Amino acid sequence: MGLSTKQITLRNLLQEHAPLLVAYSGGVDSTYLLAEAADVLGSRVLGVIADSPSLPRQALAAALENAQHFGAQVRILATQELEDPRYSSNPVNRCYFCKAELFGRMRDLAREGGFHSLAYGENADDAYQWRPGSQAALEFSVVAPLRESGLTKAEIRLLSKERGLPTADQPAQPCLSSRIPHGTPVTREALTLVENAERVVRGHGFRVFRVRYLPISGEHPRANLQVGSDEMAALRLRASYLIPELRALGFSEVLIDPEGYKAPPHAKVRGKHDGMGIGGARSPRGHVRRQNCSSS
């Protein structure tokens, strides 16, 4: 299917599902989806941002600014996933509980506001990974127009660039909870520490990076700093004053990952339960979904 055909398919799907609520994180996919929906549906679409301690303030501000730029209406919903011990205990399917909280709030909003459907930004590449949030979408009947129209991440970036969206070349920005290893509790204090640390790193000009929260050793947690491979040289030059700044925030030790940041793989995988996703949900073309929740 050609790119123009996929665009037409997407716009037809948006018309079919109107009036529509779109889960909007400010990332590449949901930004493009909401921008297209705003063009096609006008006032019959509303973007919904889940606001919680796992969302950096900088990301929230950017999402609101971008939505205003392309003319989409947005509602901020304060979500309470951190109060759910199934989420805060940080299991491997943590993202399921986050998305279930969001989609439940969106469903209530849809009923109150007369919206017909809920949508989110899963794309065609995501269909070949195990994404716990996709199970929540299935349970709450949330549609994925980008995936259904066959649009891949690369195509969405290309179309975003054509539209002039500032997210076209934006690095992946998973929530702050993804910086905390599974099994280590997600707390407000840990999320705030990570957010402050990443603000410092960003202030030094780094573009692709993660500050990984490591389990507490003694009285304070440690951190593992990862930057993109093309920024490793810059990190070595700045480390002598960047590391002390991070330690001053509350880390007992800041390690530099010598391998740098590596994006999670998007390979298609098969297994003995081929054809079934989580919860028995069948994935397109019979592939098992590879997990992509918190490793990015």
Language model features: what each stretch is:
Residues 205-215, 257:
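C-terminal boundary motif of the adenylate-forming
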Residues 215-237:
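A short interface-forming secondary-structure element
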Residues 177, 215-218, 261:
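A glycine-rich phosphate-binding loop feature that marks nucleotide/adenosyl-phosphate handling sites
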Residues 184-191, 232-233, 266-272:
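Short glycine/threonine-rich loop-to-helix capping motif typified by GTGT followed
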Residues 152-153, 157-158, 165-174, 207-209:
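Short, structured loop/turn "capping" segments at alpha-beta junctions
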Residues 170-190:
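Internal, active-site/partner-interface "lid" segment
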Residues 188-209, 240-243:
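Short amphipathic alpha-helix segments
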Residues 1-162, 223, 241-252, 256, ...:
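ATP-dependent adenylation/nucleotidyltransferase module used to activate substrates
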